Amino acid sequence: MGDMGDPPKKKRLISLCVGCGNQIHDQYILRVSPDLEWHAACLKCAECNQYLDESCTCFVRDGKTYCKRDYIRLYGIKCAKCNIGFSKNDFVMRARSKVYHIECFRCVACSRQLIPGDEFALREDGLFCRADHDVVERATMGAGDPLSPLHPARPLQMAAEPISARQPALRPHVHKQPEKTTRVRTVLNEKQLHTLRTCYNANPRPDALMKEQLVEMTGLSPRVIRVWFQNKRCKDKKRSILMKQLQQQQPNDKTNIQGMTGTPMVATSPERHDGGLQANQVEVQSYQPPWKVLSDFALQSDIDQPAFQQLVNFSEGGPGSNSTGSEVASMSSQLPDTPNSMVASPIEA
């Protein structure tokens, strides 16, 4: 046995012609509802032998096929008086189960045409207006007391408005069913849905060859596949129309919360905030007096002390600078002779 999850493969049945009973090997097969198959040369009217194809209407009754003209002539509804059929543009009058032309809807006794609102009686021998119906009823009951109440054997009816002969109520019911059948809902599994959706994404309107391949792949009937694609296209169309309407309403959409009206906004990615201050960059430099620079240089270099002292005095010289030079001289006298005499001391934390 195969895998229970796989759909059963559809067996290709042999097509037999209903007309001649032989197998059909032709390229094209004529199918008549519900499941009758014919050769193109065997499907013809049983009365006039006219060939029937997809360009004309075919009727089946008691195993025989008829063209539209002969079927209406043989089995169509006819006027109860003139026994002539109705055209699609005719208006008719109804009396119980019988149908009449408007011109034929007359009293058989006085030939008066009955119009909507007139009372009439339908008897075995035809239509009677109320006056003639009373006369016939009295004559049938015999000569009795004229003051005795009249008990009509058949109740009177009132003529209604004429109706069109094209209404479905006047059409012959060939395949009449006593009760309305309930259509079984088809449930698709995940594999079938995946196959159908993949094909739909590639082509929402597959041709006949693609549909036949889907029938073989999914195990579904052609009708189920056709209806699924129709429903899918309808849903997508409704969804696209709804999205367009939402996009058109979005610019004019307003949000009102507790009396405050605002426009909806969409949050974007965060950006760096510069503060918005317009200022020029200022470069800060440290300043040291000249004697400080020279003192540091003397500590790190082995130079002649008198020449260095003269250089310090020269850099600090000038009018009003005697006090500064004496301070530098006294400070330099306290410095060690050479950098080699410096003793390293530990750095306190």
From Swiss-Prot:
Residues 17-70, 79-133 form the LIM zinc-binding domain. InterPro entries: HD (IPR001356), Homeobox_CS (IPR017970), Homeodomain-like_sf (IPR009057), ISL1/2-like (IPR047169), ISL1/2-like_LIM1 (IPR047244), Znf_LIM (IPR001781). Keywords: Activator, Developmental protein, Differentiation, DNA-binding, Homeobox, LIM domain, Metal-binding, Nucleus, Repeat, Transcription, Transcription regulation, Zinc. The keyword NADP does not apply. GO terms for molecular function: cis-regulatory region sequence-specific DNA binding; DNA-binding transcription factor activity, RNA polymerase II-specific; metal ion binding. GO terms for cellular component: nucleus. It comes from the Eukaryota. DNA-binding transcriptional activator. Recognizes and binds to the consensus octamer binding site 5'-ATAATTAA-3' in promoter of target genes. Plays a fundamental role in the gene regulatory network essential for retinal ganglion cell (RGC) differentiation. May be involved in subtype specialization of primary motoneurons. May bind to insulin gene enhancer sequences. Essential for heart development. This is Insulin gene enhancer protein isl-1. It comes from Danio rerio (Zebrafish). The lineage of its organism: Eukaryota, Metazoa, Chordata, Craniata, Vertebrata.
